[in-house]
Amino acid sequence: MASRRKSTTPCMVLASEQDPDLELISDLDEGPPVLTPVENTRAESISSDEEVHESVDSDNQQNKKVEGGYECKYCTFQTPDLNMFTFHVDSEHPNVVLNSSYVCVECNFLTKRYDALSEHNLKYHPGEENFKLTMVKRNNQTIFEQTINDLTFDGSFIKEENAEQAESTEVSSSGISISKTPIMKMMKNKVENKRIAVHHNSVEDVPEEKENEIKPDREEIVENPSSSASESNTSTSIVNRIHPSTASTVVTPAAVLPGLAQVITAVSAQQNSNLIPKVLIPVNSIPTYNAALDNNPLLLNTYNKFPYPTMSEITVLSAQAKYTEEQIKIWFSAQRLKHGVSWTPEEVEEARRKQFNGTVHTVPQTITVIPTHISTGSNGLPSILQTCQIVGQPGLVLTQVAGTNTLPVTAPIALTVAGVPSQNNIQKSQVPAAQPTAETKPATAAVPTSQSVKHETALVNPDSFGIRAKKTKEQLAELKVSYLKNQFPHDSEIIRLMKITGLTKGEIKKWFSDTRYNQRNSKSNQCLHLNNDSSTTIIIDSSDETTESPTVGTAQPKQSWNPFPDFTPQKFKEKTAEQLRVLQASFLNSSVLTDEELNRLRAQTKLTRREIDAWFTEKKKSKALKEEKMEIDESNAGSSKEEAGETSPGDESGAPKSGSTGKICKKTPEQLHMLKSAFVRTQWPSPEEYDKLAKESGLARTDIVSWFGDTRYAWKNGNLKWYYYYQSANSSSMNGLSSLRKRGRGRPKGRGRGRPRGRPRGSKRINNWDRGPSLIKFKTGTAILKDYYLKHKFLNEQDLDELVNKSHMGYEQVREWFAERQRRSELGIELFEENEEEDEVIDDQEEDEEETDDSDTWEPPRHVKRKLSKSDD
């Protein structure tokens, strides 16, 4: 970037002739007290000396003719053409200023010499110290415009003090934190005495200025133009006045050593903004700016969250802060101007999406710095370890300058990173800390000494980048062992696991929660309450497993906590054995839950009101179901004697008992018929309908709820073949499940599963239950397409979606079916095959029956038969 340079050594040496555009002033010994960056291959730091030797303007440098041309001092470039030489200097060495002039805007005073400008200031502006120089390039000429700044920090912008005089007044609250302003650049020349200049460059320009791609037309240089400086060997230069009790953090993006990729900066965003050095922006130039809004905590908090509020947010702020929307808009615009915030609409939207995910929004850079809490170390310097995501090249340097009461100290951090942003393990970075020097010694470059503090680890948290870290085998082993002991770990157990595994509390609790969820939803738990001797596999968060991970552990399920067979484990999924004992004791005392009892249970079990109330409700339903089953068992016991004579001993021996297990988890065809009929009526039954289904089918309410959820999912994905059969059928004509039974596979009344030798395979004895129609034909997908084809004779694309939904076929299947009909019509053959639909109905019904039930046939329970026989009589 273009800048100025003052040096006692000429930058450009002319061989023999003078350039008329370059004014040579050899009798000057001093130049302006400004230091600007120069190209250097060494890492540079900040230092100064009160003994200032102001030098000749860089635009008035001596040039030495070499073999009839011009030679560049900073490289081997030589040319006899002055224009080419000037172009080379501007393009390759933008820090070198040629052909400069000085203008006092207040007095319209123009001069080529800085000392003449200083004499003008002493004569016409006595006692004035708040000058500001603005560099402007016009017509291949650099002009420094001097203005008088009205807004101050109760003093100058840059104040030079001795090390013992580092005390100063507090920074004005109207200033802006450096952490939100363009980076302050402070550099020095190789071997010369220096002064400090503050260059306002946006943060976004830092990567680009490395390649010299952007050259701004204007650059502000803030300086203290006092020409007299006290000479001392024990002096230092302090930027902006550092608060006496503050360890301020400023940023120094310096040139790096060869081979290093880039220099990045890190400034904590959590430091008190009032204690950080400020950069002033004159807001009095905004006509309608209301300074009273600067002290409004609501607006400040809103701006700190996001600098671009929406119109709705501005309306809310206007109502809360009692200011007009226009004033609030102008205030936010001024704050963004002060802080150097200028985002494109796309960047604003992206930042709005990312403002809650833990990342700091900036224009895309090489590194995203995530602010973390800065803790003060034993040496008084703030810790400068911060979490950052490496998205560029490896081998970067994180540089930070921490200002204390005595000296500003730099502490570079060398990050040794593999350069892959999604890697699991970020290597540790060692932090050599510079030891502050309290004695009054000449302040040279603050270079880290050989002494180093205890090495700290900068471990990147992958969750901050939206990456879920894979747990190691050792971590998973510890978690599994703890899970087998207790699925709901106490705080002490979590703390122990945190120490052993190194995981955070949130990660451990989430792993336990996910594991409990996976175990509850595993297929082996469907009959857990019925098969006491079965083992249950614990599904351990499969996303944490790697290919080399050992197999998951198994454990015998504990059945003592679930004494009621009608309840699935899901109803007690979050309750411990102690909680269940308390609830059980309360239910035995009284099944009616009063408010006093509810409050007592809440305090004792730590459960919510809704959980306790739901448990009591399910308990009452379970009790009612048990009583109904007892009545059914009694009726079955009474009717068994009446039917004993109808069953031969051989057949009875071959018939399995109704209480036998083996397929007890399967739903009977009658139960499936009830559920399917209810699903066709409504996919989202009300609680009363769930209770009614549970009472009619004899299934647990949770099983019914689970079945409806699975069926809704299958319906959404188009996997229900029976839905349209039930939808188009007249449910009143379906007595039991006669329409779903296979033809010729029924069993005579009262007989076992065996078949007498003399009886044909297809014959059966018809009873009262089987008097309904043996087969009901429903329209299949092709039947719906056939009706549409007979009506329209072609496929209309507008009706394609409706046909797909009604026929339950895919888009390509529907199109192929109509294409086949068109082909048959052109060939003059039969459009539709005979008996096509009847075969499809029968096949689909048989496939559905085979998928949903393994039993060969189904007969109604005995108490239902008895009731039907009595009604017939």
UniProtKB/Swiss-Prot annotation:
There is a cross-link at K159, K441, K454, K485, K629 (Glycyl lysine isopeptide (Lys-Gly) (interchain with G-Cter in SUMO2)). Residues 831-873 are annotated as: Required for repressor activity. GO terms for cellular component: nucleus. Residues 212-221 have a biased composition (Basic and acidic residues). The modification Phosphothreonine is found at T36. Its main location: nucleus. The keyword Zinc-finger applies. GO terms for biological process: negative regulation of transcription by RNA polymerase II; regulation of transcription by RNA polymerase II. GO terms for molecular function: DNA binding; DNA-binding transcription factor activity, RNA polymerase II-specific; protein heterodimerization activity; zinc ion binding. Residues 24-63, 200-236, 626-667, 732-769, 829-873 are annotated as: Disordered. Acts as a transcriptional repressor. Increases DNMT3B-mediated repressive transcriptional activity when DNMT3B is tethered to DNA. May link molecule between DNMT3B and other co-repressor proteins. This is Zinc fingers and homeoboxes protein 1. It comes from Pan troglodytes.
